[in-house]
Amino acid sequence: MSVLLREVVGSVRTPRAWRCRVPVVNSQLRMSGTVRRFHFSRPVFNGVEAVKLPSTYEEEKVIIDEINKELPHADLDASKRMRNIGISAHIDSGKTTFTERVLFYTGRIKAIHEVRGRDAVGAKMDHMDLEREKGITIQSAATYCSWDKEDTAYHFNLIDTPGHIDFTIEVERALRVLDGAVLVVCAVSGVQSQTVTVDRQMRRYNVPRVTFINKMDRMGADPFRAIEQINLKLKTPAAAIQVPIGAESELKGVVNIIDRVALYNEGAQGETIRSAEVPEELKELVEEKRALLIETLADVDDEMADIYLEGEEPTVEQIKGAIRRATIGRKFTPVLMGSALANKGIQPVLDAVVDYLPQPNEILNTGLEVAKSGEEKPINLLPSSSAPFVGLAFKLEEGQYGQLTYIRVYQGKLKKGSYMTHVKTGKKVKVARLVRMHSNDMEDVNEVGPGEICATFGIDCASGDTFMGANSDQLIAMSSMFVPEAVISLSIAPKSKDNGAFSKAMNRFQKEDPTFRVKFDPESKETIISGMGELHLEIYVERIKREYGVECITGKPQVSYRESITAPTTFDYTHKKQSGGSGQYGRVMGEFSPLEGDNKFSQHIVGGKIPEKFLFACSKGFEDCLEKGPLIGHKVLGVHMHINDGQTHVVDSSELSFRTATQGAFKQAFLEAQPVILEPIMSVEISAPNEFQGSVVGLVNKLGGMILETVNGQDEFTVTAECSLNSMFGFSTSLRACTQGKGEFSLEFCKYSQTSPQLQRELIAEYQKALAAKK
């Protein structure tokens, strides 16, 4: 585990049941595991106190029930009628189309418009011109709406997220602040690569979900195969709570198998739901799937297990209660089905959100209370309007009135005109304007309470920062979202001399998007941008042109390699610089070894041979070396440096001496430890019509990829493979050529793996040549 306990903290990896507590200045800590909910018993890892997670939702619920006993009735009632949900899925599964129907059926919009701007309008939630042109969601978009169920109006805060892996940070930040989600799965393609990624993200933030199998009107739709894949690939117990009436072009509606009622969408746009008896030809299937639902629930819910074992027939209320408990407990996902494009099956999903997803006070949210002495302790946040305000800034956008900051309120109220404290800086900021977002439209409000999502202007902050009420005696910090590492880079420069607008764009975009990195290379004198993929960087280059009027010249995309070692070695390095007057002297000795995962620095000095302040300088020297390896100048991964001895000079030793000595020892030991270059390996999923299967498999083999799985459908096949990112440049052109433009693919970072010896030699030679040219 590599931890830098100062202003900057990198990815911290710990045993799964533990997550590190860090000083409040590190409120933007990037976490590689669950980041939101934790409990109280606290051992220590490398001097960093950790907090144990409740092992089950039942343990969380004990705390939640105690909190709810203290809440005022008004807060309980407001929370009962509120749901915070996200819509997530693999690209092109129909998320935005689904969201458009949700907004229409809840009365939030007056007309339905389709993705890609086919009618010159485009879907409401895809408000960027680039989104409408490309037909994909690039930024998550927030809105709110109301849904009436059984004469009660429920308030939904809803976020539509991108499906493309290049924009995965939008999913991360949405799930960080949401209480539940609707996972959309294609009835034809089933569980795809990004579905697996979204599932992993939901688990990371403990977000329960209901699943909607979309595109039931398409040829080859098979909802029960998709449910089987959810069980097998996502390892999530799932069962249908509906069966379709008809399929493909004959899709007419769905049967709710819990209460055995057929539901038909009628009206020009499916706005009317007509209930009827179950068609005779479906009664046997309904009973079969109902029995399977009860059996699955008996495996994940104790109350249903008792009913099942006693041979009793559960009531509708008992089945719904079991589904709700198991779903909120993250043990089960109920599956609904329909077609968003055909306007069928959407309203029952809204009912399922009310019935099965949690209200804000059913989720345990926790922060770190920081005392004036600096001592930190976990504290449970109270979803009460009378408690001191606590909110998390989870998304930034540049609006026409300045920076727009999205905030999730966890505790207390936020009022227009009030002041709040930025926990990281201690500054008090005024909430001059408070709005609720409806995609790119804003609606002013005077105050928002616990569980709400809002936005405000003119606040200088970063994603993941915590805010508190200005008059609060407490200081509470909340953990941020997980930020993945960039895998691709390219050089960029403005064509014109308009460096002011170019710099402004760079600063804005890297502030809004933590996965978009900008750095200046002092050797090449170039600005380097890094991101999650070719499309990710391509979008930003286009946005610089459109939003700032700056055309840019870009270099060839470069892979973000890593440097590592494969054998242990020892080091004994002396840094000596004496040329009259005060000199420099530092000697370090120890061991250098490969390590799986992140980097680690440790020391064990007996007898005070190296003073503590010099040891800290050694750790800083180690951190410096990790940024630029000796082989090709890329970041270092998977090394453990342990200092166990050393020597000082009474006059010439200093922090700089030992920092420099450590850097020299690092380089010397690294080159002796059988160094290797690691390249990013991508998980690739390719779909195309069956007649092109041979061509696609041949293309993957030509790229040196390893095929993991091939699934043949009625009309299409899907190949899952692992390929090096280096071989994937220009892949979209090759795939179009061999499938006549009918193939699709998606990429996701999988792991780092050793390059071939030939490629390693070529990369080193190229790097050495570039260095020589600069001399």
Swiss-Prot record:
Looking at the Swiss-Prot or TrEMBL record, what is one Pfam family this protein matches?
GTP_EFTU_D2
One of the protein's GO biological processes: mitochondrial translational elongation
Transit peptide endpoints, chain numbering = 1-45
Q: Which GO terms describe its molecular function?
A: GTP binding; GTPase activity; translation elongation factor activity
Give the highest taxon in the source lineage: Eukaryota
Keywords from UniProt, A to Z, are:
Elongation factor, GTP-binding, Mitochondrion, Nucleotide-binding, Protein biosynthesis, Transit peptide
Instruction: Give the location in the cell.
Output: Mitochondrion
Q: Does the keyword GTP-binding apply?
A: yes
Residues that bind GTP:
89-96, 160-164, 214-217
List, alphabetically, the PROSITE patterns matched: G_TR_2 (PS51722)
Using the record's annotation, list all stretches that form the tr-type G domain.
80-361
Q: Identify the GO cellular component terms for this protein.
A: mitochondrion
InterPro entries named among the record's database cross-references: EFG_II, EFG_III, EFG_III/V, EFG_IV, EFG_V-like, EFTu-like_2, P-loop_NTPase, Ribosomal_Su5_D2-typ_SF
UniProt pathway: Protein biosynthesis; polypeptide chain elongation
Function (record text): Mitochondrial GTPase that catalyzes the GTP-dependent ribosomal translocation step during translation elongation. During this step, the ribosome changes from the pre-translocational (PRE) to the post-translocational (POST) state as the newly formed A-site-bound peptidyl-tRNA and P-site-bound deacylated tRNA move to the P and E sites, respectively. Catalyzes the coordinated movement of the two tRNA molecules, the mRNA and conformational changes in the ribosome.
Similarity comment: Belongs to the TRAFAC class translation factor GTPase superfamily. Classic translation factor GTPase family. EF-G/EF-2 subfamily.
This chain belongs to the protein called: Elongation factor G, mitochondrial
Q: Which organism is it from?
A: Scheffersomyces stipitis (strain ATCC 58785 / CBS 6054 / NBRC 10063 / NRRL Y-11545)
Q: What is the lineage of its organism?
A: Eukaryota, Fungi, Dikarya, Ascomycota, Saccharomycotina
**Gene that encodes it:** MEF1
